[in-house]
Regions:
Chain B
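Basic, glycine/lysine-rich polyanion-binding surfaces/domains
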Residues: 1-195
Length: 96, 195
């Protein structure tokens, strides 16, 4: 499986670390809403198809990335910096 | 000034090794720069940091991810968004950057004693490195001057292409001897000379 890092270009999955489900919303640290905390810790969509995920290019530029991966085919349909657009991007053949 | 010791020393054997009967196809050496610093810009401050790099080193960074340049014993390359590695044959880079990069622009980390730079040069340099790293070493994908961040068996490496057939590999000092030995083994096939 290859993940195309917006900075480094296509790299083998071995350079990346999975940082978890990208759909989770972390409650405010002081929040006493236990249902929200429970949902953050335990509730997962577990889709058979496209899934929003957070990965880190830990064996490369170390950027945190927002990745959409198909759980059935491993096809990756989008990769973006988790913190929004910043810095220069590698020019990809046929892709922007 | 205290003399810096090389972490490669017990396994650094100058001379020709491996299958060199028909000549050596790579030369391995340690470049031992006097200073290595890592610079990081806060988001939005990248242009100011690039201007500071130019003011301190005289080097103008080319645009684009991983862009870099070397000249006059100094080199700089991008290794992550808004982050750059600068090396200089002379000491004193960290002090110069500490003056030029204020806390509103970003950070300066002195790695002069924390990294070891191993140079591999020669017609088979790409061939040998391709055994280690799953990245494209072809010139159009990895132009002269540019840098790449990658890893070999969890040994993080920043690779700076300092010539068409020449690469400078920045590794953690504590992993340098292990990496060096692996690089020597991988070079036996093509014949190598340690200088
Ligand atoms: Zn990356």
């Amino acid at each position: 499986m290859l993940i195309t890092c917006p900075y480094c270009g296509p790299r083998d999955v071995i350079e990346f670390t999975y940082q978890g489900d990208g759909n989770r919303e972390r409650p405010e640290p002081a929040s006493q809403n236990f249902e929200a905390w429970n949902a953050y810790v335990y509730d997962r969509l577990n889709p058979a198809g496209d899934h929003n995920e957070i990965w880190q290019h830990s064996g490369g530029c170390r950027s945190h990335l927002r990745v959409v991966r198909n759980t059935l085919t491993h096809e990756i349909s989008s990769v973006a910096f988790a913190r929004g657009d910043h810095g220069p991007r590698r020019k990809m053949e046929g892709k922007s | 000034m205290v003399e810096r010791l090389s972490p490669l020393e017990p396994d650094f054997h100058p001379g020709s090794h491996g299958n060199f009967e028909h000549g050596v196809d790579v030369i391995l050496t340690e470049t031992r720069p006097g200073s290595i610093v890592q610079l990081a810009a806060w988001p939005g401050e990248e242009k100011k940091l690039i201007a500071a790099i130019r003011a301190v080193t005289g080097l103008a960074l080319p645009d684009g991810a991983g862009g870099g340049i070397s000249s006059g014993g100094k080199s700089v390359f991008g290794f992550a968004p808004g982050k750059f590695t600068v090396a200089d044959d002379a000491e004193g880079l960290a002090e110069a950057f500490a003056k030029a990069v204020g806390p509103a622009i970003g950070t300066v980390t002195d790695l002069s004693h924390g990294r070891t730079v191993i140079r591999i040069a020669g017609p088979k340099a790409e061939w040998v490195l391709a055994k280690f790293f799953a990245i494209d070493f072809a010139l159009p994908a990895f132009p002269v001057g540019s840098g790449r961040s990658t890893a070999h068996h969890d040994v993080f490496a920043q690779i700076h292409r300092s010539g068409t057939d020449q690469f400078d590999i920045h590794v953690f000092r504590s992993f340098a001897r292990s990496f060096w030995k692996a690089l020597c083994h991988a070079s036996e096939e093509v014949g190598y000379e340690v200088q």
